[in-house]
């Protein structure tokens, strides 16, 4: 007998369920002991409580699945006025796409399964695409009040029903508005065509976060980026992942401000994430850690808009920080403070334990060695690297010899990624990735599955979402991990 687990993503036998339950209970007991010691006090041990589900307990664990988006036509409108597009400078759209594809290839060579937004949009049901496109295609008839609104809407729906998959995707990414006016010539209509394309979608770090408990859909600080979350939500649905929370109302949350760190969650509060967003996360028990450290940014500078632009983690006892923050003195805008929230093991409600603590001191008290990132390297996005395994990072190429030496002295393997065009969008290797799962202990494989129509399973090396080897072939079409690689069954 095969039973579908609650997450809807994997199938295991009854015997496997009993084995999994037993091992899970052991992990829970270990977690309770570790959390009791660490969550309400500063812990130097840096235990990495690693979830059986593969959700990242810590930034330094081996990456298994990553969601990315290779930019396309939607990028052009952003580069013709970079500031309005939330970009730093003009950059070549075609070169940027080429760089992004190269980055994906480098990740895949490390055994990472990369899921792209465009591939997912090419796979989902066309009705799902039509729902998204319906929200984005606008007929503006305000300039012709004598036109019947119901007739105009019926015409719009008729066009949407006829649209091909490719054109529905263009509607979703370009967000077109047709501003209509009347004329006596030709068809009787003229139009001004306006686009509000999702030029920042390639920064897939920001629309969601992945905590030890699961996935959270963010509420973006910039209104022009708000529609991106609907696309990412659809991607999660297609991958068989159900987000546990969506930030709403006045709450603001962007993924670049969140870093899981073993027994604690680090969350930045500043330009893009606010206290209300953090409150919603804690109230919903979405962090999955008994200690939450709110890192307060007092500088509010675009170049350091998120926590991951000035602080990052390489291993359980090694991190980086830009020199201006590392060396800042109390009272200077670069000086980060942090508030530490904690709760008793087994309880839900957090309480403020310590407030306005020096962030650098806190990090060092937890046993981290800090590699400084000097100004010139910071301006080249050196701190915005992606950790794909302990002391193994993907970082923007072209950094100083001094920084290269610092990494080498710390035993860090660095793969230098050519991202010269893409970084002019105000982000780099970390910003362009959303790590959906990181491997658990041992040699298990964590893999995201894709919802599919019918199965064609030819390999017995199949794994469930929690990384457990399945005996024989999966019995259903919506779970299929072939030798650790996602297979899309059409």
What are these regions (language model features)?
Residues 5, 18-31:
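Bacterial N-terminal signal peptides that target proteins for export
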Residues 46-442:
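The feature marks the mature, well-folded catalytic cores of soluble enzymes
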Residues 41-45:
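Sec/Tat signal peptide C-region and signal peptidase I cleavage site
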Residues 479-490:
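C-terminal tail/sorting-segment detector
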Residues 31-40:
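Bacterial N-terminal signal peptides
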């Amino acid at each position: 007998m095969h039973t579908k687990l609650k997450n809807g993503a994997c199938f295991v036998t009854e015997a496997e369920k009993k084995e999994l339950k037993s091992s899970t209970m052991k992990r829970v007991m270990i977690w309770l002991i570790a959390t009791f010691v660490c969550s309400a006090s500063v812990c130097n041990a840096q235990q990495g409580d690693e979830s059986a589900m593969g959700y990242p307990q810590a930034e330094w664990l081996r990456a298994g699945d990553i969601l990315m988006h290779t930019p396309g036509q939607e990028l052009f409108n952003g580069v013709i006025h970079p500031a309005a597009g939330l970009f730093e400078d003009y950059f070549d759209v075609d070169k940027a796409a080429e760089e992004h594809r190269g980055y994906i290839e480098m990740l895949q060579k490390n055994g990472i399964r990369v899921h792209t937004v465009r591939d997912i949009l090419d796979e989902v049901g066309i009705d799902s695409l039509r729902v998204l496109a319906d929200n984005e295609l606008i007929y503006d008839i305000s300039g012709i009040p004598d036109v019947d609104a119901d007739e105009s809407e019926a015409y719009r729906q008729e066009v949407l029903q006829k649209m091909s998959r490719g054109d529905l995707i263009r509607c979703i990414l370009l967000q077109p508005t047709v501003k209509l006016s009347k004329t006596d010539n030709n068809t009787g209509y003229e139009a001004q065509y306006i686009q509000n394309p999702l030029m920042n979608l390639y920064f897939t770090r920001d629309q969601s976060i992945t905590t030890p408990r699961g996935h959270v859909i963010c509420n973006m600080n910039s209104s022009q980026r708000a529609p991106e979350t609907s696309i990412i939500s659809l991607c999660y649905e297609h991958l068989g992942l159900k987000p546990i929370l969506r930030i709403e109302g006045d709450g603001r949350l962007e993924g670049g401000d969140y870093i899981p760190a073993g027994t604690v969650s680090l969350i930045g509060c500043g330009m893009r994430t606010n206290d209300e967003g953090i409150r919603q996360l804690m109230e919903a028990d979405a962090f999955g850690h008994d200690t939450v450290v709110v890192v307060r940014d007092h500088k509010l500078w675009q170049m350091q808009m998120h926590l991951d632009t000035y602080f990052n983690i390489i291993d359980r006892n090694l991190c980086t920080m830009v020199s201006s923050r590392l060396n800042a003195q109390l009272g200077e805008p670069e000086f980060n403070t942090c508030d530490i929230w904690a709760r008793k093991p087994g309880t839900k409600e957090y309480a403020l334990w310590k407030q306005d603590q020096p962030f650098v001191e806190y990090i060092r008290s937890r046993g981290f060695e800090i590699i400084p990132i000097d100004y010139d390297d910071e301006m080249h996005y050196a701190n915005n690297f992606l950790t794909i395994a302990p002391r193994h990072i993907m970082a923007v190429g072209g950094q100083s010899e001094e920084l290269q030496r610092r990494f080498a002295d710390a035993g860090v393997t660095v793969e230098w990624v050519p991202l010269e065009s893409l970084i002019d969008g105000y982000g780099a290797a970390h910003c362009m990735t959303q790590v959906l799962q990181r491997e658990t202990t041992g040699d298990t494989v964590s893999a995201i599955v894709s919802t599919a129509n019918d199965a064609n399973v030819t390999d017995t090396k199949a794994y469930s979402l929690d990384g457990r080897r399945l005996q024989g072939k999966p019995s259903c079409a919506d779970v299929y991990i072939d030798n650790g690689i996602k297979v899309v069954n059409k």
